[in-house]
């Protein structure tokens, strides 16, 4: 049994030798072949989940493949500072000690965050190592390291100077816990709420209009009531005034096409400071903008007696007051979509605030370059999603009300001058005042990670880390990056932003190829969640099975564009595969103590030539699939070669030609190189066992050359495929007459291609030994009184002269009778209209399928009986 505990030792040896670094494969590097892939930097607070495991596995397969194929490879690792998440973790720890961050002040709090990062952050890095991934660890970056801080400042200042970053009062998404959010940080969910119909009386009149709203707590901020200009019901009221309940403030009735006449009563309140659409209406009609609660969602002085209440708590009390005063006409159940903060699940509020924004015009160049095909998406349909999102792009809110993060490099002096600077200024550049302060907000985390594809290669770092973790030629060698692999769920959060931020600076898209994988779900296709109890923890899977088994399972399931349905059964299947190739090693070493490298021997055995031809087909298919990111097809090709071609038939056939074993072992060693990017540890172990070496004192398989395809004579494959077909067919025919493992005197083979028998005569020993026949004869006619098995290219006959058929016929008749009874029962059930009408659909379908299977079995037994009776 393979010892998975070797994985840690093997990994440590390879890392210490520097194999993962850019020049780790220097002995096999070829000129002008560079490959770069960026690790999506996981949060410093994170632990390895199954989505990470998939991303990192696929990235590492490509990294190892390219490294073995002679490329100079950079697999860039890193961690994201994760502004909100990290600040929340440290805040909670301090609160547990009875300390609020405000008591410490900004500088001391940030020191605490750095302390936490050094002590507890980055746990995920060790978990990545257990997965066996091979990034250039010496180049590990953190989105808050000094070099990347320099790059962020440079990017910000350049955009600021181009007026592509601006500050102003905007309607934004606001979380009362986490502050400003960009549009894609808001998750919309179905909500079972209420629609409140409130009476707004006309000024100096007993007439009233009924306004429908889902958010009565905001009505103190109403500055108009709105109807559709074509709604004849309300035409006479336009330009008149209504009186707000409770506050008794007069507001105007306006007409605007934004109103849906069919919604509620056709009359809606306009709250420009608390609704995205009303904000636009307010601008069009020059309305007042009145905010009725603060940044924490607490109602302010505009709300009279309700001041000091939290917005959602206030709703019930405001409605109760309106009801007591007779202003509520009715309340209806109402389903709608509500935005929630993607981090804390708090209801998000539209809120007017002075924030920093990146103008949407920044994306234009990247849109044009994608249209020209400079980046290719896998699967291709993601280009449609990318284009649709970019087409509807809005200005991106990049300021966050946090302390942990990249503080916005904008300064304000006492004379109200504003400027951006990459370095802390000494005086105001306009008035030379020394009395100035820096903007207190920090940048959205995605702003810094949006520079990742170029900042990790030294762009904007100034001299920090130069010649230690990056070099001057990195941008030339590795930009644009060769490939990005990540989940489709961050296409807009991260990928699109990297594309427009990098292109705006370097005028070149950051990636040649973009592979977006789907989600990892359970075997029933459900999302993994703690509540369902269906979460597969990769850390536990590695402990129970091994890193190799998890990696190969994920690769087998990674079909482009389809969700990955992972289960323990799939992991067990790959464990069986691992045992299969481990046992192949045992068989080989029973016959030989050591196997030469394939390049150092000449193949003489016909069997070895056949297995080598199958291996070359495998090489061709694996390379082609990896080059097109069809990971599942590449893994399946390897699975079939090792299991079917080598273990099932190569080893089996070698029992008839013992001299072939030495050559088969050399082929097996070469095939382990092909497997290594997928299963690096067991391939390493088996390779050294067959070479009679140890990794401690020998080079690793991971820096050997990846096998290249060499065309082979197809005739040897044709001959051996007929041999195998003959063996299988004879075994099948023997099983029909209960002679499964017994030796028989003679079998006859009738080939569809009569010419082939002359070529195959030399190989009869394989059939005689493995099919257990004393003799094989060729026939050109069907034999009477013989059991027959028909396959694609031949027919097998075994005469029945000396076979007692009575017991066999009785057994088959009994089987037939049993199947007929089961078939009759199912047929009766499916002919019953009541059963069809009342049974669950899936039960009906299962019974139909069972009936079809019974028919097939009955037909097969009938044919067998007919053959036996002549």
UniProtKB/Swiss-Prot annotation:
What InterPro entries does the entry give? aa-tRNA-synth_I_CS (IPR001412), aa-tRNA-synth_Ia (IPR002300), Anticodon_Ia_Val (IPR033705), M/V/L/I-tRNA-synth_anticd-bd (IPR013155), Rossmann-like_a/b/a_fold (IPR014729), tRNA-bd_arm (IPR010978), tRNAsynth_Ia_anticodon-bd (IPR009080), Val-tRNA_synth_C_sf (IPR037118)
Has UniProt tagged this entry with the keyword ATP-binding? yes
Role: Catalyzes the attachment of valine to tRNA(Val). As ValRS can inadvertently accommodate and process structurally similar amino acids such as threonine, to avoid such errors, it has a 'posttransfer' editing activity that hydrolyzes mischarged Thr-tRNA(Val) in a tRNA-dependent manner.
Species, as recorded: Campylobacter jejuni (strain RM1221)
One GO biological process this protein is involved in is: valyl-tRNA aminoacylation
- The reply on keyword Nucleus is no
List its EC numbers. 6.1.1.9
Sorted alphabetically, the keyword list is:
Aminoacyl-tRNA synthetase, ATP-binding, Coiled coil, Cytoplasm, Ligase, Nucleotide-binding, Protein biosynthesis
Protein name, UniProt field: Valine--tRNA ligase
């Amino acid at each position: 049994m393979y010892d998975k505990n070797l994985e840690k030792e093997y990994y440590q040896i390879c890392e210490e030798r520097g194999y993962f670094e850019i020049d780790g494969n220097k002995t096999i590097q070829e000129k002008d072949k560079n490959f770069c892939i960026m690790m999506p930097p996981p949060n410093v607070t994170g632990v390895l989940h199954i989505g990470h495991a998939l991303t990192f596995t696929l990235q590492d397969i490509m990294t190892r493949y390219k490294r073995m194929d002679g490329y100079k490879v950079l697999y860039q690792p890193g961690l994201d500072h994760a502004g909100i998440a990290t600040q929340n973790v440290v805040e909670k720890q301090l609160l547990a000690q009875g300390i609020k961050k405000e008591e410490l002040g900004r500088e001391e709090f940030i020191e605490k965050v750095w302390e936490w990062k050094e002590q507890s952050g980055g746990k995920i890095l060790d978990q990545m190592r257990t997965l066996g991934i091979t990034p250039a660890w010496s180049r590990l970056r953190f989105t808050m390291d000094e070099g990347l801080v320099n790059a962020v400042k440079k990017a910000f200042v350049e955009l600021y100077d181009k007026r592509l970053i601006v500050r102003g009062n905007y309607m934004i998404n606001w979380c009362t816990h986490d502050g400003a959010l960009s549009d894609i940080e808001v998750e919309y969910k179905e909500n079972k709420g209420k629609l409140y119909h409130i009476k707004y009386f006309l000024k100096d009149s007993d007439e009233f209009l009924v306004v429908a709203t889902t958010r009565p707590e905001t009505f103190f901020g109403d500055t108009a009531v709105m109807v559709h200009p074509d709604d004849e019901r309300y035409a006479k009221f336009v330009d008149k005034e209504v009186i707000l309940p409770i506050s008794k403030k007069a507001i105007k009735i306006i007409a605007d096409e934004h109103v849906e006449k069919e919604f509620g009563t056709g009359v809606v309140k306009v709250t420009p400071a608390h609704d995205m659409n009303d904000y636009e209406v307010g601008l069009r009609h020059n309305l007042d903008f009145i905010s009725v609660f603060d940044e924490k969602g607490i109602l302010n002085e505009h709300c009279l007696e309700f001041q000091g209440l939290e917005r959602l708590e206030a709703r019930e009390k405001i409605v109760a007051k309106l009801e007591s005063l007779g202003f509520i006409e009715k309340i209806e159940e109402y389903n709608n979509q509500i935005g929630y903060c993607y981090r804390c699940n708090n209801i998000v509020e539209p809120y007017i605030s002075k924030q920093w924004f990146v103008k949407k015009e920044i994306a234009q160049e990247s849109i044009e370059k994608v249209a020209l095909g400079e980046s290719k998406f896998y699967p291709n349909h993601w280009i449609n999603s990318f284009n649709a999102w970019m087409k509807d792009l809005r200005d991106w809110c990049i300021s966050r009300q946090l302390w942990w993060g990249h503080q916005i490099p904008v300064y304000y002096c006492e004379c109200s001058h504003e400027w951006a600077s990459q370095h802390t200024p000494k005086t105001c550049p306009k008035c030379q005042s020394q009395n100035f302060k820096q903007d207190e907000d920090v940048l959205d985390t995605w702003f810094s990670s949006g520079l990742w594809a170029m900042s990790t290669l030294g762009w904007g770092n100034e001299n920090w880390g130069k010649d230690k973790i990056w070099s001057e030629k990195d941008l030339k060698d590795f930009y644009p990056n060769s490939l990005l692999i990540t989940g489709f769920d961050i296409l807009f959060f991260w990928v699109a932003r990297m594309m427009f931020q990098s292109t705006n600076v370097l005028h070149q898209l950051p990636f040649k190829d973009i592979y977006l994988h789907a989600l990892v779900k359970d075997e029933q296709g459900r999302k993994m969640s703690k509540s369902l109890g269906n979460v597969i923890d990769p850390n536990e899977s590695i402990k129970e099975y091994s890193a190799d088994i998890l990696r190969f399972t994920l690769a087998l399931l990674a079909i482009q564009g389809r969700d990955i349905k992972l289960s323990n059964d799939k992991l067990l299947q790959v464990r069986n595969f691992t045992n299969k190739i481990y046992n192949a090693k045992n068989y080989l070493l029973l016959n030989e103590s050591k196997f030469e490298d394939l390049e150092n021997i000449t193949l003489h055995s016909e069997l070895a030539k056949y297995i080598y031809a199958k291996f070359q087909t495998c090489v061709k298919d694996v390379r082609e699939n990896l080059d097109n990111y069809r990971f599942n097809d590449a893994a399946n090709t390897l699975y079939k070669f090792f299991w079917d071609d080598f273990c099932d038939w190569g080893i089996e056939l070698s029992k008839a030609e013992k001299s072939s074993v030495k050559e088969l072992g050399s082929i097996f060693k070469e095939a382990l190189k092909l497997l290594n990017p997928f299963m690096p540890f067991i391939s390493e172990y088996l390779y050294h066992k067959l070479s009679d070496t140890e990794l401690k004192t020998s080079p690793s398989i991971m820096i050997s050359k990846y096998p290249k395809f060499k065309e082979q004579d197809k005739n040897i494959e044709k001959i051996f495929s007929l041999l195998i077909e003959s063996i299988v067919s004879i075994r099948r025919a023997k099983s029909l007459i209960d002679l499964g493992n017994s030796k028989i005197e003679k079998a006859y083979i009738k080939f569809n291609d009569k010419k082939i028998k002359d070529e195959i005569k030399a190989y009869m020993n394989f059939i005689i030994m493995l099919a257990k026949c004393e003799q094989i004869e060729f026939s050109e006619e069907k034999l009477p009184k013989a059991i027959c098995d028909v396959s694609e290219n031949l027919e097998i006959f075994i005469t029945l002269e000396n076979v007692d058929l009575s017991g066999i016929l009785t057994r088959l008749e009994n089987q037939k009778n049993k199947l007929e009874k089961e078939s009759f029962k199912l047929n009766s059930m499916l002919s019953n209209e009541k059963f069809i009408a009342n049974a669950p659909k899936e039960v009906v379908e299962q019974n139909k399928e069972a009936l079809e299977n019974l028919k097939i079995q009955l037909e097969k037994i009938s044919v067998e009986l007919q053959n036996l009776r002549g």
